[in-house]
Structures are given as C-alpha cells and as structure tokens.
Regions:
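Solvent-exposed, conformationally flexible loop/turn segments
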Residues: 16-21, 489-491, 499
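Extended acidic/polar, glycine-enriched regions
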Residues: 43, 49-112, 117
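Aromatic- and carboxylate-lined catalytic core of secreted/periplasmic carbohydrate-active enzymes
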Residues: 11-12, 33-34, 352, 365-486, ...
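Short, flexible/disordered intra-domain loops and linkers
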Residues: 243, 279-284, 353-362, 395-396
Length: 514
C-alpha cells in the first residue's frame, strides 16, 4: 500500500525472494529534464553485502530504484538524490528463492557457465531481434513457442530494426519524438532508408518510459520461463538515427538502461550486434561504453560484443564470454586464443529466404550445433522461413523448422554429461571429441563424446585405455535415437550404420554420469 509522506507518494517492496527484484518508488520533481538533470541513488545494506545502486526517472513524476538481493537477510536502505528534498529509509526481508530461481548465470570452469546457486547452465540460444516490439498477440505467441522450445537464452534488441523483412513500424520508440514516415517503405526500397532519413525528430535526452517498461515486461516473462535475456544494446540496422547518436547520448542511454534492467537476474549485456558494421563507433568508444556498463551494473551480469566481419578483441577483461558469428569449426582454437566460453550466437539460419545467411538446411544447422558442442563451445539457433506475418529471426511467432526438436535432443545429451562442461580432446585426426572439462571427472567417468558430422563411417576403432570396461552408445543426432551396443575393453571396433550426423558416446561401465 502506498504511503504519503509530507504530501509525497512513496512505496517499496516489503519482502522479496533472493535474486528477485526489490523496487522503491517515489514522487519527485518534474522541473527541467528529469532524465538529464535529476538523480536518485540508494544504499542497500545487510549483514553480508553493501551496494550503492542508481535509480531512474520513470515518467509522470515517478522515480524508481531497483535492487537484486543476494542473501536471505534483513536489508536496510537509504534513498537520496536531487529528485526530492527528502531522504527515505526503510527495511525489507529477503526470503528463500522459489523453485525455478537459481540466480544469475556466471562463468564457471573458465569455458562454461553456472547459476549463482551452482546449478549448471548450458546455453542453447536463439535469436529474435525485435520480438519484444511486436503486437501483444505476437508476443504472447512467441512466449508460448519459447515455453515449448529447447531454448534457454534469446538475443533481442532495445532499439527497433530496419532491414529486409523489417519494414513495419515497431510498437514503440525509446525516445520522445516522431519517426521518419515509413508508409512508403517496401522490401525493394527499405535499404534506401538509413539513420539520416529525413523526418526523424527525436529528443535523445528524453526517454519514452513506456518503451522500457514494455521491455521489462518481456524480460520478466522470459524469467518465468527460465530463459536468459541477452539484450543487444546497439546495432547498425536503423532508419531512425538511434545508431548515430552522440557519445554523450549513448552514455546517457547506457546508464538509463543499466539502472532499469540490471536488477533482473536473467539479463545479459550484448554491446552490439555486428559491432564492426556500426561505422561511427571506434574501439575507444566501445571500450568507454563497456566501462559505463561495468560501473553501472552492480551485479556484474555477463557481457559480450558480437561481430560482423571482424572479431573484437575478446581478451579484454570486461568481456566475460565470446559472442561469435561464424561457422563453429574454429571453436577449439577460439578457446585457446581467448580463454573464455565460446558462444557462437550466429551460425547462419535455417530457412528459405534469398540470402545465403538465411537458407541453410535444418540438417546443417543441427550439424553446426553438434560441431560447436564437440569442440568445447555452444551454438545458437535462428530461423528465417518466409512468412507474411512473422519470421522467427526477427519477429518471433511460431517455429516452422525441423532443427528445434533435434536441438532439444542435443541439449538432453549435453545435460546427461558430467557437470562442468566439456572440453575438446585430440583423438584421431578425422574425428572430433569432447571429455569433461574437470580432469578428475574425466578420469572418474571415462566420458567421451565423438561426432562425425557429414562423414558416414561403417565402423570405427576406439581405444581409451587397457584397464577399464566401457559402455558404448551410438547416437543418431538427426533421427534422435540412442542405441547401446555393449561394453568393451582395450582397443575395440564399433560397427556404425553408414549414415551422416552420428555421434558415439563412451563411458565407464557401471558409472552413473551426473
């Protein structure tokens, strides 16, 4: 229930679960430009943590601060700033996390991930660039599709997108103002509309809170489904001028976005989609923007920057994992080069559009997922089947392809492997293989996963060691079958069905793989 203190409406969350979102809000001044000239900051303290958090102006005279507590304790907070001539204090309690709340995803075992509570997290992502800026009905359909999909991460943008099959106007814009008239845009002329298109009239120092409120709704709905929100902060596909704002406006945007979104446990920061195609931003700019997010996000969410033609220097300390656009055959080498988790977020898309990046077969996309996995990394899904209403890669809606159920099968195989992720192991020259990243688990379980891709061997010889008995499964990654073919010792031959997309799983007999 709202409180009124000296004529000012104020309220805050009295109880929140661990890794949930606490929120304080209060009326404040509307004089001048509150987005630019007003501040609200809170100090949160418990027995085990102390954090200072920046808040934001949410429009209509309301200021907010959000906080994600990491301990089941009593917290005290103090709120101050020039949004008001008052200082506010209060306490709230933090309860145990609910069943599906595992906290934030963090890097684990150098090349892999886990949640805050130690639960393993294996990214199986998809891309829907502006699903969040579609109609209510289409958003609801996307969420229902995701509910029944194998995907536990989704990449999407804050800014709308102008591109092939993306000529319609978004549901909202991030700033106050008016857009270029898009009524005459077609698939034939959409490329003629760029960030300098005449007719745009924006105030880049005044945000549209409703745009951000809606994205927060989408983040929250993803959280309910256990899906990570990989938020793309900048991209080059723009007819409104959002990609060519001044550095000062970019910095204001980053601080505002971090203040609004950071308290959601499922947020990841993707600084750009195809950073190198945004020609007006230098490496020095990207480094400065990265530091703004690092300083503005008190929870240290995962951070990456996605490439077009040229990789970013992923050795930079602010980059937590590599977000890559390439075919996955280089995964093992990227692990060596960067010493970080490898997530190949774009490996081309299953579909039938005219462009080569969007018309590979489902068999090829599934092969790429397995190649990424069996080279020690993680793949990303996308789908571009022609549809007058919605194409998954950008708008969401329904999945039409044949790869998702095979990706779900691969995810099951991955989750059955020993915890802690898998690393590449050199075996024969013409095969790829992964074993547990943890050397003790590798020795204890003897787990090996081989993948043969487009090769069609009729048999293979294997030799793990001479002392242990190993059980062998033949996995058909396309037909989604697992066949146990017995137990073996020493050097042994396994007859295979002379089909593409086969994997072979070997582990010590009698061991329960956990």
């Amino acid at each position: 229930m709202c409180q009124r203190i000296g004529g000012t409406v104020m309220d805050y969350t009295k109880s929140v679960e661990k890794w949930g979102v606490f929120e304080f809000y209060s009326e404040g001044t509307t004089a001048g430009n509150p987005f630019l000239e007003r501040s609200i900051t809170a100090l949160f303290e418990s027995d085990s943590e102390r954090k200072t958090v920046n808040g934001f102006y949410d429009g209509n005279g309301i200021y907010k601060v959000r906080f994600m507590p990491s301990f089941e304790e009593e917290y005290h907070f103090t709120v101050c700033g020039n949004f008001s001539d008052r200082k506010y204090e209060g306490t709230f309690s933090v309860t145990p996390p609910s069943e599906n709340n595992h906290g934030c995803v963090k890097v684990h075992n150098k090349y892999h991930f886990q949640y805050s509570d130690g639960t393993p997290y294996y990214p199986v992502g998809t891309t829907c660039y502006v699903w969040n800026l579609q109609s209510d009905d289409l958003i609801a359909q996307t969420l229902e599709t995701l509910r029944n999909s194998p995907f536990n991460k989704i990449r999407f943008c804050v800014f709308p997108k102008s591109y092939c099959y993306n000529s319609r106007e978004p549901r909202s814009y991030p700033y106050e103002g008016t857009p270029v008239d898009g009524s005459a845009i077609t698939e034939d002329n959409v490329w003629g509309y760029g960030p300098d298109s005449k007719g745009n009239n924006w105030d880049f120092e005044r945000f549209n809170p409703k745009h951000f409120q809606h994205i927060e709704y989408c983040i929250g709905e993803l959280q309910k489904l256990g899906i990570e929100a990989d938020i793309i902060l900048f991209h080059p596909y723009d007819r409104w001028g959002f990609s060519t704002m001044t550095a000062e406006c970019n910095e204001l945007y980053l601080k505002y976005t971090a203040a609004r979104f950071s308290a959601f446990r499922n947020v990841w920061w993707s600084f750009a989609n195809e950073y190198d195609l945004i020609k007006n931003k230098s490496i020095e700019d990207w480094e400065r923007y990265a530091q703004i997010i690092v300083e503005s996000d008190p929870y240290d969410h995962l951070r990456s920057i996605h490439n077009g033609n040229q990789f970013y220097d992923h050795t930079k300390s602010w980059i937590t994992h590599c977000s890559i656009q390439r075919s996955p055959e280089g995964t093992s080498e990227w692990r060596k080069s960067y010493g970080k988790p490898i997530v190949i977020d774009e490996m081309l898309y299953e579909g039938n559009i005219q462009y080569a990046w969007g018309n590979i077969s489902p068999q090829e996309l599934v092969r790429r997922f397995w190649e990424a996995l069996c080279r020690g990394g993680y793949g990303g899904h996308g789908e571009t089947y022609i549809d007058d209403k919605a194409i998954w890669w950008s708008h969401g809606g329904e999945l039409k392809g044949d790869s998702p159920e095979r990706i779900a099968f691969m995810r099951k195989i991955l989750e059955e492997a020993p915890d802690g992720g898998l690393r590449p192991k050199n075996m024969e020259w013409d095969e790829i293989c992964v074993v547990p990243e943890d050397e003790n688990l590798a020795d204890e379980t003897g787990y090996h996963l081989f993948y043969y891709g487009i090769s069609r061997p009729g048999f293979r010889y294997y030799h793990i060691d001479d002392n242990n008995i190993y059980t062998v499964d033949i996995i058909d990654s396309w037909n989604m079958t697992v066949e146990n073919v017995g137990s073996f010792k020493g050097r042994f031959r396994i007859d295979l069905p002379t089909r593409e997309y086969l994997a072979v799983r070997i582990k010590k007999a009698g061991d329960e793989i956990e």
